């Protein structure tokens, strides 16, 4: 499991983001979702996150810029993700599925992201 923290841009605003390969899905807090179109899934989604079970009935499409690279991915909206070890609130938890989709690899020894596998185009079969 690898974790990297850095800011990404959502609608021109920098958002503190945790890239976590131990999390399957991507999550955003309501202040981030306010800049995005939120939809209501047909059922409540429950997820174990940060030692507790959180519920949501809101989802969004996260459109963001990571180190200048545009990304789009599905995200669940939850009231609170948690804080990092410095006490800074995490606004976005970027999960493993989205990292795989966008070719993002955490490099924990250097505390950075490797975007050398970012797809310039998608090839579908």
Question: In which residue ranges do the predicted regions lie?
Answer:
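C-terminal reverse transcriptase regions that engage the nucleic-acid substrate
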Residues: 43-58
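Short glycine/proline-enriched turns and hinge-like loops at secondary-structure junctions
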Residues: 20-21, 57, 86-87
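Short solvent-exposed loop/turn micro-motifs enriched in small/polar/acidic residues
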Residues: 1, 10, 55-57, 97-99, ...
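Short polybasic/polar patches that bind polyanions
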Residues: 34, 65, 100
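Aspartyl protease active-site motif detector
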Residues: 4-46, 75, 93-95
């Amino acid at each position: 499991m690898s974790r990297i923290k850095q800011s990404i841009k959502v609608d021109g605003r920098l958002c503190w983001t945790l890239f976590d390969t131990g999390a399957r899905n991507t999550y955003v807090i309501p202040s981030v979702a306010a800049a995005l179109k939120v939809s209501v899934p047909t059922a409540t989604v429950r997820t174990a996150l940060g030692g507790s079970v959180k519920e949501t009935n809101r989802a969004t499409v996260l459109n963001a810029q990571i180190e200048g690279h545009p990304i789009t991915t599905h995200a669940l909206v939850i009231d609170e993700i948690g804080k990092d070890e410095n006490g800074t609130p995490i606004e976005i938890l970027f999960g493993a599925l989205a990292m795989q989709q966008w070719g993002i690899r955490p490099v924990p020894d250097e505390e950075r992201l490797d975007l050398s596998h970012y797809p310039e185009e998608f090839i579908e079969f």
